[in-house]
Amino acid sequence: MRIKATVERLPGGMMLVPLLLGALCHTLWPQAGSTLGSFSNGLISGTVPILAVWFFCMGATIQLRASGRVLRRSGSLVLTKIAVAWLVAVLCAPLLPIGGVSSGPLAGLSVLALVAAMDMTNGGLYAALMQQYGSSEDAGAVVLMSLESGPLISMLILGASGLASFEPQLFVGAVLPLLLGFALGNLDAELRQFFAQATKTLVPFFGFALGNTLDLSTIAHTGTSGVLLGVAVVVITGLPLLLADRWIGGGNGTAGVAASSTAGAAVATPALIAGMAPQFAPAAPAATALVASAVIVTSLLVPLLTALYARRGDARSG
């Protein structure tokens, strides 16, 4: 049976299919973890420890050595995306309830969902698109995008926009696994290769554990708003990223379009933020479902738009 190939036909499938299975498990048997206990409970409720290992392994993949041009290109994209997410948070905070919109086509939408969906790029998708439509320097820009992994950037944005305050040790705790992995990966290339193998392996495990915090009714309730959020991510972050790539990064804009996606790891951000800032707890389940939808929508739209933009540029140069 070609289970893996079938699952991967869905954009972000290795994250989203286990997430849906976890949500199904939680909907049909909410007490499964506490009833089974032991290792089964660890798989069902172990979102944070599984993600901690994933962040460590992700940190190990970040290489210290990169050319100035690559750092300029990746830095312009990362900083632009963070700035856009911060601006959206500032503008939308007075308009949206802290617990999210309760009904209508924007049901579940919250500042937490917006920030989580907009501040983290799908690095794998970006690298694949740049290998096809960009240069090696474009593809190398993924080196700094790995720093967006985890809740740290969302914490900084929510704190800078005045929506939350976090104790200093929480920032340290959020970034420490990534830094430890980064240090080991740069001290020993063999360790970097060893830990890098686990980054993809752990994805379905934290997807399943995260799904066990959701109810299928929540996912159904936020269906329309999830699609709208995905489109909004591409539109709202795409244009500034395109301009930043052209004016700051020295590219032709293709890399900017390719970076206007939502990373699969962003699905975990609402729950992690809610664990540190309880005022976001009511918004977290719906925000998780919304971000999961945004992952799918952006994974479908971004490759199409990147291809169209790249071909348009080729036609002009030709």
Swiss-Prot record:
A Pfam family hit: KdgT
Predominant place of localization: membrane
Lineage: Bacteria, Pseudomonadati, Pseudomonadota, Gammaproteobacteria, Lysobacterales
Signal peptide start and end residues: none
Protein function: Catalyzes the proton-dependent uptake of 2-keto-3-deoxygluconate (KDG) into the cell.
InterPro entries reported for this sequence: 2keto-3dGluconate_permease (IPR004684), 2keto-3dGluconate_permease_sub (IPR018395)
Protein name: 2-keto-3-deoxygluconate permease
Transmembrane spans: 10-30, 42-62, 82-102, 109-129, 139-159, 163-183, 201-221, 224-244, 257-277, 289-309
Record key words, sorted: Cell inner membrane, Cell membrane, Membrane, Sugar transport, Symport, Transmembrane, Transmembrane helix, Transport
GO molecular function, one term: 2-keto-3-deoxygluconate:proton symporter activity
Subcellular location: Cell inner membrane
Keyword Aminoacyl-tRNA synthetase (UniProt): no
Membrane-topology annotation of the record: Multi-pass membrane protein
Cysteines paired by S-S bonds: none
Catalytic activity: 2-dehydro-3-deoxy-D-gluconate(in) + H(+)(in) = 2-dehydro-3-deoxy-D-gluconate(out) + H(+)(out)
GO cellular component, one term: plasma membrane
Keyword DNA repair in record: no
Organism: Xanthomonas axonopodis pv. citri (strain 306)
Family label: Belongs to the KdgT transporter family.
